[in-house]
């Protein structure tokens, strides 16, 4: 019985931390991007993260060779941005920051994985959060 209480206590302490995540407002999974045009990445901070200390993010893209996409934990691909993330309040829309990048002509057409890597400090926890999107270019 004490073991169950211990597990419940650990779960209640860990659950709020695991729920702390950032979101991608754009682009969305399956978006088609055109070579020679700019695209905007919108990184959203949910209100539940208002007390989190932001360290930084990286935004990267990797081609899927022969239909096989690399795992973002193994390969980031071309890093488009690595640095501070400072979301600001917008009405409506909450807290977010936009980043704009070009799709250059040397980028291979076809599916690609876009990776948002997030590092933040939540209390005494050190957490990295990774999200990925599949793009068709």
Regions found by a protein language model. Name each.
Residues 1-23:
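Fungal secretory targeting signals
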Residues 17-44, 49:
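N-terminal edge beta-strand
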Residues 18, 51-53, 108-110:
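Short loop/turn segments at connectors of secondary-structure elements within structured domains
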Residues 24-29, 81-86, 98-101:
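Short structured motifs
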Residues 38, 45-91, 129, 134:
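Contiguous segments within soluble domain cores/interaction surfaces
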Residues 42-44, 60, 102, 117:
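Residue-level recognition of well-ordered beta-strand positions that form the cores
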Residues 96-136:
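Internal, hydrophobic beta-strand segments that form the core of beta-sheet-rich folds
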